[in-house]
Amino acid sequence: MGDLFSLFWEVDPPPIPVNCAIPNQDYECWKDDSCGTIGSFLLWYFVIVFVLMFFSRASVWMSEDKKDEGSGTSTSVRKASKETSCKRQSKDSAWDPSQTMKKPKQNQLTPVTNSEVALVNAYPEQRRARRQSQFNEVNQNQHDSDTTEYGSEESNSEASSWKESESEHHPSPDSIKRRKMAQRQRNLGSYQMSERHCLHCKALRTNEWLAHHSRQKPSVTPPMKRDSQEESSISDINKKFSKF
């Protein structure tokens, strides 16, 4: 029963009562004000996109025009240079039909411009500059390596001298003992030498004194005996002093 009633309702809906008014769609859109905002947003969106496209295309057109103008000026300059070179060649050499018949390929070649000649002349100069720069770099690297080696040698020498100075400032006990022994030996040697010198001087003085006094005393003995006695006395004194 429910299914039949639903089918009937879909085929023949119930009539709308007279008191209910049909709502106007335009009035509702105006009341909500949502349709107007959406439409204005879409309109301005398309306008902005169109303006951006126009400016982008205008910049592209301007760049193309500049390129065309530059290419036109370059072609005009090339043509003028070619014409001037042809005129110079025609002035330098007179026209000979036999030469043109013999050498048609040479006439077909385009004349050389000044820019091409400048490029050809600049190529060896560029090569020389590159070689010079490479040579300078190699010399600089060698100089840097030499300076580093010299600096390392200086640092090593400074380190060794610093170690030696430290060892001198802080001597070991063995070195102290050695120094003391050497000083003692030196002192003993100097004392012995001074004693020897003093004894020798005393012996000489005594000999002089004895010789002086022996000359003053009168003696009956002949001079040969006196000399022998003096020599024996001097030898005895020297022996005593040497034993002492």
Swiss-Prot record:
InterPro entries: DUF4636 (IPR027955). Its main location: membrane. It is found in: Membrane. The keyword NADP does not apply. Keywords: Membrane, Transmembrane, Transmembrane helix. It is a single-pass membrane protein. GO terms for cellular component: membrane. The chain crosses the membrane at residues 35-55. Pfam families: DUF4636 (PF15468). Residues 80-94, 161-176 have a biased composition (Basic and acidic residues). The keyword Transmembrane applies. Residues 96-114, 132-142 have a biased composition (Polar residues). Residues 65-114, 126-191, 210-244 are annotated as: Disordered. This is Serine-rich single-pass membrane protein 1.
